[in-house]
């Protein structure tokens, strides 16, 4: 079936390869939402999944222990060396007490207060990248994705994990490989990423500094339970993977602002709106369309349908974040919207994004720097296009005139 048609049971069926779904997923998932709180999504080569389309149902599922994340929730490239596999099992693959323990140990390094303390260092990175962006411009046009939004998160990760300046070019290459997706380039980069992460943890242990890993080693030093080096290496790996989310959030936010001149003008006139603006941009045009699928641990009845044990279940954030039952006038971009709107852009429940405060800080600093440096910033004539990815809303490029 195509975009939001229903099967004989009345549950909407969404073909993730349908051109309309790929062109405008918010609209496609939104049509399914208005038909039913529960739908099915499918694509050739992947198992069908149940999808919660409305805000209330999505929020409930993300907090329901009957649906769990695990290794099967992720697709990994083939040929990864055995010694790397132990480092690849991040918190996202853990549940229950195991997940709670790791989350408790690492959370002190990811508080809003710590993100605020790191903010001046993020600002310095942004200013350097903006200087370089001008150098990449040809006839006044530059690709903001390639030369700003993509390198920024990896530069921040290097800064926050204490990676030496001399080693950062290699880490930029790692970030580019991760951004490329699940291809051979990604698989080939994994051993080098793990080796670099092991070295970063060892350096922070022997020479503590003002960085995230040293924070974790110091905070836990006096406690019986503390993160092992292998767990810290896994955290660095997780940061490298998660860095792609701020990339897409920043690029989407710039694209959206440049297409809404009245909202852009309001933000320029009142920079104090920036925290609310970033929350609204995350809700309205966030990069996560579908959450990482969870597996039902037992038979569960949802909205009149039987979810069998082992079935995959996801939440359509693209439709939940525009659900009129939860958010007033949800299809309107309003940078002054009150944060109480309660979007799910960073997830919900035990797996709420650990780095949400850091992602917000990066995005706020990036947008503020761009708007300040380039008052005439505009989309170039060659309009950007989105990649055909039904799970992640991400641009192929972002050509702008400076």
Which residue ranges define each predicted feature?
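Cytochrome P450
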Residues: 1-402
